[in-house]
């Protein structure tokens, strides 16, 4: 775990650099399996990752303009209620609806928290609590076209039946050295573009479609295929989820976005259409409205 001092140091630097999102991304309750995690939590004075997460989020949210956005894995209704006090939004990736990826030798073998039903339950909990969520697919985990088509179809269905979803990330698998999947094939640009276009056509229009720009070197192609978001790009830190892939240069990226007849601009972790009292607690609603323009974006 980062210490609270480190959390605040990073968040303050982001706040000073005009960032609006402090991403809290972490393992799913590691203290259940790892004694080292439990011991460190105890050293900090907490019994669970969730308790420590809430404490860190509270400190950031109450002392800065920057907003926590959380990816803590599976979330119960009670946990989401806690998170909603200090953050405007959260996220959980579905990754794939395939059952085969849980087989021996496959990406999710022996996992217990990546089961689709459990992740869908988290999204349903968010809907009941009214907590805006990001979700998405990890493209390249499955091996057959039938599985891929099912992933797309199921994601469309989920997006139509769960109004808490504000954004769908389409993330392409990138092989990493020293991992069991280091020799696995990566998705081709042509297929990736077709998937993006299909998702954009069939998911509700208010849902943003994102492709991480540091995982897709030909981002100019993807800008024309239906995406309208590039996710968080940090001026301070590496991409800790994909540390081998550097962030793009913002000036060059802005030029590519303009070529696609769009404009690159900052946003909050919560999209403008969700900045409503039913989706936010009163204090968060007020904090957000103090810094946004009439379109729901940060004032320049």
Task: Say what each PLM segment does.
Residues 1-161:
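Conserved Radical SAM active-site core
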């Amino acid at each position: 775990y980062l210490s609270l001092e480190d959390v605040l140091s990073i968040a303050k630097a982001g706040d000073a650099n005009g960032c609006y999102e402090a991403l809290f991304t972490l393992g799913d309750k590691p203290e259940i399996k790892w004694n080292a995690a439990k011991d460190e939590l105890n050293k900090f004075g907490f019994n669970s990752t969730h308790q420590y997460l809430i404490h860190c989020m509270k400190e950031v949210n109450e002392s800065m303009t920057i907003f926590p956005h959380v990816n803590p894995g599976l979330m119960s209704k009670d946990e989401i209620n806690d998170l909603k006090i200090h953050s405007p939004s959260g996220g959980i990736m579905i990754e794939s609806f395939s059952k085969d990826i849980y087989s021996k030798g496959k990406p999710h073998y022996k996992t217990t928290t990546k089961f689709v039903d459990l992740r869908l339950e988290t999204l349903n909990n968010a809907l009941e609590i009214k907590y805006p969520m990001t979700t998405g697919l990890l493209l390249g985990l499955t091996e057959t076209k039938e599985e891929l088509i099912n992933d797309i179809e199921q994601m469309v269905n989920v997006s139509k039946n769960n109004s808490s979803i504000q954004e769908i990330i389409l993330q392409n698998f990138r092989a990493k050295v020293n991992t069991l999947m280091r020799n696995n094939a990566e998705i081709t640009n042509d297929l990736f573009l077709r998937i993006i276009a299909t998702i954009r056509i069939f998911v509700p229009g208010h849902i943003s479609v994102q492709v991480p720009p540091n995982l897709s070197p030909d981002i100019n192609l993807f800008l024309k295929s239906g995406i309208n978001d590039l996710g968080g790009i940090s001026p301070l830190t590496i991409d800790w989820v994909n540390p081998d892939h550097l962030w793009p240069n913002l000036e060059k990226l802005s030029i590519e976005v303009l070529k696609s007849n769009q404009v690159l601009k900052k946003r909050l972790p919560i999209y403008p259409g969700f900045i409503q009292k039913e989706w936010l607690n009163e204090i968060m609603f007020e904090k957000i409205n103090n810094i946004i323009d009439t379109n729901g974006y940060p004032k320049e």
